[in-house]
């Protein structure tokens, strides 16, 4: 069935405003608003209902058009001696005539200025009466029309266009800085500030700095993003290390989540405070939070470990240690389970007497300290050499995919 016949069928059953009629055929023709589409369809139906050569007209269609607010149909029927009262739109109850978009925009501006929010992009979310949604679905379903769009989507688009022009900001469906919520029942508005996700890496230049807690990596990160005036800050790390471990090289990946920030300009450069460096700060998204947690174990790490041997070993044993731990699987007890990780390579560098430096290239997600001592780990450095081996210093030289 054609658009015109579908529209005639709809109007004969329900009075519909231009917006709601046009929205039934939203996917049938681009570059035209729903209101313009609905108005054009009514005009075509009006012209088809009149036969100037015979002087006849289709009264049923004209009455349906008049009830739906078509001005020309109302005037024509009145001239024919038939007074038809316009009826409220069955779907929206003439919501588009009642809503004042300019008033809504003014309220949004006032709310943004009141809160002092800095933003570059926005999204609009509207709420409408439940009955409107039900009537919309009822009409589309009964008539078998599959080309429609929701009234909320049209409202969001109309309000969004005016807001974009008025505020000079960009509309974003995927990653907005703020979400503007409009209640069409009472015209109230609210502004929800979305979190900022900041991808970064951190280095720990000195020992004794924990990842979280007081005087930690987390406290430095919170101090840095306090300039954004957030309500709260949540840190997401790609793995953990103890306070005694330095993190060097490229640093450990992290995501800084600043909730409800009033400022959104990210600090740049390398930031050094209290023995912690934050670097490579850039905007991220929620998907990166999931990735940093799920893929932490896939990150490769290079450790520098200074160890003490509690017993004698030969040069041959040390050389064989390097060969043995080349692409070797390590099994490590973790609570009630066991993890299997890969050691890609191990290099032994004698330092002095019983002190050795080990450079370990490994898959992430296991305890390198226990790999040295042998606690819950098979095979281990201590177990392979057959003597007690204890770590003195641990540095993370690099972390990468």
From Swiss-Prot:
Domain of life: Archaea
GO molecular function: tRNA binding; tRNA pseudouridine(55) synthase activity
Class of this enzyme: isomerase
Enzyme Commission number(s) of this protein: 5.4.99.25
Domain THUMP: 64-195
InterPro entries named among the record's database cross-references: Pus10, Pus10-like, Pus10-like_C, Pus10_THUMP_arc, THUMP_dom
Disulfide pattern: none
Catalysis performed (reactions): uridine(54) in tRNA = pseudouridine(54) in tRNA; uridine(55) in tRNA = pseudouridine(55) in tRNA
Recorded family membership: Belongs to the pseudouridine synthase Pus10 family.
Protein name in UniProt: tRNA pseudouridine synthase Pus10
Biological source species: Caldivirga maquilingensis (strain ATCC 700844 / DSM 13496 / JCM 10307 / IC-167)
């Amino acid at each position: 069935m054609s658009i015109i016949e579908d529209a005639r069928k709809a109007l004969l059953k329900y009075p519909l405003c231009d917006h709601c009629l046009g929205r039934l055929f939203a996917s049938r023709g681009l570059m035209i608003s729903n209101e313009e589409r609905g108005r054009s369809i009514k005009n075509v139906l009006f012209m088809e209902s009149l036969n100037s050569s015979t002087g006849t007209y289709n009264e049923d269609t004209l009455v349906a058009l008049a009830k739906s607010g078509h001005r020309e149909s109302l005037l024509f029927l009145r001239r024919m001696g038939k007074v038809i009262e316009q009826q409220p739109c069955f779907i929206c109850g003439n919501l588009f005539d009642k809503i004042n978009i300019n008033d809504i925009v003014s309220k949004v501006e006032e709310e943004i200025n009141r809160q002092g929010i800095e933003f570059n992009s926005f999204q609009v979310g509207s709420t409408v009466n439940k009955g409107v949604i039900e009537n919309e679905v009822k009409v589309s379903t009964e008539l078998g029309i599959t080309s429609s769009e929701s009234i909320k989507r049209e409202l969001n688009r109309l309000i969004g266009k005016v807001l974009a022009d008025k505020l000079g900001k960009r509309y974003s469906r995927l990653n907005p800085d703020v979400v503007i919520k409009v209640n069409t029942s009472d015209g109230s508005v609210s502004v929800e500030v979305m979190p900022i996700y900041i991808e970064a890496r951190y280095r720990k230049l000195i020992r004794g700095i924990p990842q979280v807690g007081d005087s930690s990596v987390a406290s430095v990160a919170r101090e840095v993003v306090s300039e954004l005036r957030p309500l709260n800050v949540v840190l997401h790390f790609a793995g953990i290390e103890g306070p005694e471990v330095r993190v060097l090289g490229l640093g450990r990946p992290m995501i800084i989540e600043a909730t409800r920030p009033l400022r959104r300009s990210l600090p740049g450069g390398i930031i050094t405070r209290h023995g912690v460096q934050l670097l490579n700060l850039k905007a991220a998204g929620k998907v990166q939070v999931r990735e940093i947690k799920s893929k932490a174990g896939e990150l490769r790490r290079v450790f520098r470990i200074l160890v003490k041997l509690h017993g004698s070993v030969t040069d041959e044993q040390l050389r064989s240690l390097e060969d043995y731990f080349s692409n070797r699987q390590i099994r490590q007890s973790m609570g009630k389970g066991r993890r299997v990780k890969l050691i890609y390579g191990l290099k032994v560098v004698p330092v002095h007497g019983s002190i050795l430096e080990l450079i370990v290239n490994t898959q992430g997600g296991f305890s390198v300290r226990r790999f040295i001592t042998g606690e819950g780990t098979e095979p281990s450095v201590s177990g392979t050499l057959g003597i007690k081996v204890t770590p003195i210093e641990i540095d993370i030289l690099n972390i990468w995919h």
